Amino acid sequence: MKPQIYILKNTHLEVHISTLGATLTRMLTKDLQGKVVDVLLGMEKAEDYESPEYIASGAYLGAIIGRYGNRIARGRFEIDGVKYQLAINNGENHLHGGLCGFDKKIWNVGQAGTDSLTLTYCSPDGEEAYPGTLQVKVGFSLQEKALRIDYEAVTDKKCFVNLTHHPYFNLNPEAVKGYFT
């Protein structure tokens, strides 16, 4: 399945979201002079997020992070006496969901509107060695001058879950012209 871009708009904001990694790719708003600027650092084109170079970079620009955001020491944890060994992808640690975390998955569209979008993903039992099937829903909604992100996760086994997003906001676009976008 090919990733799709959805555009949310209201009077103050325009937000572009890719189904690849539930990634925020652009956030357009007016600066103090009334000029429309993109305040997210990201790749130039949506398809650049699929390039081998970007994937190998470990940048996570604007993407959802999961099943577990941050590091798990040595990729190990224990729940109810059962030991789990996750993939090691950051020195000796497990980072941001592993080698093929939620940032690399194509998400399904649950609902799409002009100012809101709901994406869903089902992470099967054993994916990246995590226990339990995990049903995830992330909702994006524009509210005046804000982007709201809501997360919902339900699992059928005990498991750690720590979802987050990884956007980089640039409030001075002139300072980094040509760096990413």
Where are these regions (language model features)?
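Surface-exposed acidic/polar loop and edge beta-strand patches at domain peripheries
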Residues: M1-T181
